[in-house]
UniProtKB/Swiss-Prot annotation:
This is Protein APCDD1. It comes from the Eukaryota. Residues 1-26 form the signal peptide. Keywords: Cell membrane, Glycoprotein, Membrane, Signal, Transmembrane, Wnt signaling pathway. Residues 27-495 are extracellular. The lineage of its organism: Eukaryota, Metazoa, Chordata, Craniata, Vertebrata.
Length: 515
């Protein structure tokens, strides 16, 4: 039974919403003005949308992140979980940087996607020298490094034998036939003083040290809980190209062992590990992928080809359709928008990947797209193109959305319609109980995974679920989202959120009576 006071508050809030927010309110719909239940449904939808809006707006306002320039990397940095590199390779990292510019890095490799069964460890020693701020990747710092020594330790006899054979294929005779490698014994793969270099068999490179970024933030606005993150350069998605590739994006960040998220169990385990005691992470069951609800970026993301963006995905599992909002920026903290893309289409039912443990394969089709230039430079660029290559010729204006479906996409942005992509997803749950959604890493060469053989074997930065269910496609009103997620967002959103939240709390028991 609902409380009398709550009933009065409910109708008072409805009056405030209807009177104070005006026709621009997301709560007002033509079909919702005459029926209380329709109003409640609209209010609940606005509550969910404002949750996602609030999370993205937090990123677009800088997310209270401080970027250290030049970065101070001295200290001990560790992975926050089991990382997946293209191949796939399952790895955790533990890197120490010393005051004299030397470093010692552990790379622990595993036989599965939960990092519970270590197979071998690389111990890398060398020297690093920070250079200037990157001219290519804003917010990053370029660096040079020199290797002194690379050692390998196998954690089982079977792995030792396999690695011996692998190394001998690229370095014939490196491992004597009468003296194969043994378990838990350290062997040199690279030694500077005698010219020993047999790392090619493992497609090994430390070019990740050529691009560095350090971020600091206080979790939950608590000045006693500083978290420092070290972003190192990305690894080429084609393993054979790693030793020739200069990073143009970042890997998942390492956290400072001294200033890390206290909920990170993996951080503490990896911190205490070494080559003879590799980290064994707590086992977890793979979560079944359910593509439904709404998901948003957790940080300003960096892509190869110097792209900064945030993403908002909406999945309608009742009819296997999806919507994607891609907000592009000119800066590494996503404060200065350049253009937005709204895309929608269909996706297939998921199939467990036979190549990437823990992954689920999907096929996504894009058949509808809209573009909005958000600055003068982008609008001018789009207006340069002749004919019907990207919307109506010469018609682009800042902040005005245009449908490019009828021109089969937008040549200026490298997008052709219709378009098909072969995707891989995985789902995890963080320490706070939030669901995370990972989709496939984009190819380092800038191409698209438009064929099955180009399907990713590693993942992008995860999205976090902001709403467990999605509005019906006709209710999503993508045209209204451009302004809300840009730096030009209206100022009324917080009041809408609070009023809607109060309305939801006060109508909960009312709904139960009628259910």
């Amino acid at each position: 039974m609902s409380l009398p006071c709550c009933g009065r508050v409910r109708y008072l809030l409805l009056a405030l919403l209807l009177h104070g927010l005006g026709e621009g309110s997301a709560l007002l719909h033509p079909d919702s003005r005459s029926h209380p239940r329709s109003l409640e449904k609209s209010a609940w939808r606005a509550f969910k949308e404002s949750q996602c809006h609030h999370m993205l707006k937090h990123l677009h306002n800088g997310a209270r992140i401080t970027v250290q320039m030049p970065p101070s990397i001295e200290g001990h940095w560790v992975s926050t979980g089991c990382e997946v590199r293209s191949g796939p390779e399952f790895i955790t990292r533990s890197y120490r940087f010393y005051h004299n510019n030397t470093f010692k890095a552990y790379q622990f490799y595993y036989g599965g996607n939960r990092c519970t069964n270590p197979t071998y460890t690389l111990v890398i020693r060398g020297k690093i020298r920070l250079r200037q701020a990157s001219w290519i990747i804003r917010g990053g710092t370029e660096a040079d490094y020199q290797l002194h020594n690379v050692q390998i330790i196998s954690h089982s006899e079977a792995v030792a034998e396999k690695l011996s054979q692998l190394v001998n294929r690229t370095c014939p005779g490196f491992v004597p036939g009468n003296s194969p490698w043994e378990q838990d014994v350290s062997y040199n793969l690279w030694r500077e003083e005698n010219g020993c270099e047999c790392t090619r068999a493992l497609n090994f490179a430390m070019h990740e040290l050529q691009l560095i970024r350090v971020e600091k933030q206080y979790l939950h606005h608590n000045l006693d809980h500083l978290v420092e993150e070290l972003f190192l350069g990305d690894i080429h998605t084609d393993a054979t190209q790693r030793m020739y590739y200069r990073p143009s994006s970042y890997q998942p960040p390492l956290q400072n062992a001294k200033n890390h998220d206290h909920s990170c169990i993996a951080c503490r385990i990896i911190y205490r590990s070494d080559e003879h005691h590799p980290p064994i992470l707590p086992p977890k069951a793979d979560l079944t992928i359910g593509l439904h609800g709404e998901w948003v970026s957790q940080r300003c993301e960096v892509r190869p080809e110097v792209l900064f963006l945030t993403r908002h995905f909406i999945f309608h599992d009742n009819n296997n359709t999806w919507e994607g909002h891609y907000y592009h920026y000119s800066d590494p903290i996503c404060k200065h928008p350049t253009f937005t893309i709204y895309a929608k289409g269909r996706y297939s039912r998921g199939v467990h990947s036979s190549k990437v443990m823990g992954g689920t394969e999907f096929v996504f089709k894009v058949n509808h797209m809209k573009v909005t230039p958000m600055d003068i430079a982008t609008a001018s660029l789009l207006n340069v193109f002749n004919g019907n290559e990207c919307g109506a010729e010469g018609s682009w204006q800042v902040g005005v959305q245009q449908d490019v479906t009828h021109t089969n996409g937008c040549v200026a942005l490298g997008i052709r319609l219709p378009h098909t992509e072969y995707e891989i997803f995985k789902m995890e749950q963080n320490a706070r109980g939030s669901y995370l959604l990972y989709n496939g890493q984009r190819p380092s060469d800038g191409s698209s995974p438009d064929r099955p053989e180009k399907r990713a074997t590693s993942y992008q930065m995860p999205l976090v679920q902001c709403a467990s269910s999605a509005p019906r496609p006709e209710e999503s009103a993508e045209e209204n989202k451009i302004g809300r997620y840009s730096s030009r967002a209206p100022k009324k959103d917080s009041s809408v959120f609070m009023l809607t939240l109060m309305l939801f709390i006060c109508t909960g028991s009312h709904w139960n009576i009628h259910s």
